[in-house]
């Protein structure tokens, strides 16, 4: 990936910014998906047929027609076939610009956000805004599957490497869901840590748990956006394990009132936006 790309140098990430309290859709900034997909060789055709970046917006507020502040939580689903990623700091600044803006209804806010995000992403976006009382009905969930974290192994490499993926898949064909809560990468621009849990669902030759964990831990000093990390993991597993079916789904902890949860699959539909214990 060309980290010196002009569009990346223009991002507000890592720079002092002014917070606006009047609605301004121009605050949204896009990162072209092709920048990372070029390095993976998947610009023209992606190995996943279904994908979405699932966001939860915890800090959403506006004024009603009488000037009374309203607060809500929203789900946003951005199709992975869209041209662009939404840069998270710009998303936060954009949402803050609603704070002193009057809207007739929650539905009007929802339509406005959906329209603005669709234009920025250049693709399909859905937005659902919830009252706090409705969102409170959601219970804390966890990924289904076997957790691979409690292995009695020594690890001393934390820079990204694909070495451990050599010979990762052997034996009979199985259908499994594997989970790790040890995913940690760093922001592409600021190097701030991004913490997440990951679920890998597949049909294929059985994956070696130790090799898989070593590979995931190697992201610990790796600098990429959430969405890019998940696509890299998907592509690497397809290359080295060659499963018949594969899903990679990561849920990251929130920052700035937003959490980002990329989902990529070649056989499953987009899941409901759950909430995990660290979210």
UniProtKB/Swiss-Prot annotation:
<dbReference type="Pfam" id="PF14489">
    <property type="entry name" value="QueF"/>
</dbReference>
<dbReference type="GO" id="GO:0008616">
    <property type="term" value="P:queuosine biosynthetic process"/>
</dbReference>
<dbReference type="GO" id="GO:0033739">
    <property type="term" value="F:preQ1 synthase activity"/>
</dbReference>
<dbReference type="InterPro" id="IPR050084">
    <property type="entry name" value="NADPH_dep_7-cyano-7-deazaG_red"/>
</dbReference>
<dbReference type="InterPro" id="IPR029139">
    <property type="entry name" value="QueF_N"/>
</dbReference>
<keyword id="KW-0560">Oxidoreductase</keyword>
<keyword id="KW-0521">NADP</keyword>
<keyword id="KW-0671">Queuosine biosynthesis</keyword>
<feature type="active site" description="Thioimide intermediate">
    <location>
        <position position="187"/>
    </location>
</feature>
<comment type="pathway">
    <text>tRNA modification; tRNA-queuosine biosynthesis.</text>
</comment>
<protein>
    <recommendedName>
        <fullName>NADPH-dependent 7-cyano-7-deazaguanine reductase</fullName>
        <ecNumber>1.7.1.13</ecNumber>
    </recommendedName>
</protein>
<dbReference type="InterPro" id="IPR016428">
    <property type="entry name" value="QueF_type2"/>
</dbReference>
<dbReference type="GO" id="GO:0005737">
    <property type="term" value="C:cytoplasm"/>
</dbReference>
<comment type="function">
    <text>Catalyzes the NADPH-dependent reduction of 7-cyano-7-deazaguanine (preQ0) to 7-aminomethyl-7-deazaguanine (preQ1).</text>
</comment>
<dbReference type="Pfam" id="PF14819">
    <property type="entry name" value="QueF_N"/>
</dbReference>
<feature type="active site" description="Proton donor">
    <location>
        <position position="194"/>
    </location>
</feature>
<dbReference type="InterPro" id="IPR043133">
    <property type="entry name" value="GTP-CH-I_C/QueF"/>
</dbReference>
<feature type="binding site">
    <location>
        <begin position="255"/>
        <end position="256"/>
    </location>
    <ligand>
        <name>NADPH</name>
    </ligand>
</feature>
<feature type="binding site">
    <location>
        <begin position="226"/>
        <end position="227"/>
    </location>
    <ligand>
        <name>substrate</name>
    </ligand>
</feature>
<feature type="binding site">
    <location>
        <begin position="88"/>
        <end position="89"/>
    </location>
    <ligand>
        <name>NADPH</name>
    </ligand>
</feature>
<dbReference type="GO" id="GO:0006400">
    <property type="term" value="P:tRNA modification"/>
</dbReference>
<comment type="subunit">
    <text>Homodimer.</text>
</comment>
<feature type="binding site">
    <location>
        <begin position="86"/>
        <end position="88"/>
    </location>
    <ligand>
        <name>substrate</name>
    </ligand>
</feature>
<dbReference type="InterPro" id="IPR029500">
    <property type="entry name" value="QueF"/>
</dbReference>
<keyword id="KW-0963">Cytoplasm</keyword>
<comment type="similarity">
    <text>Belongs to the GTP cyclohydrolase I family. QueF type 2 subfamily.</text>
</comment>
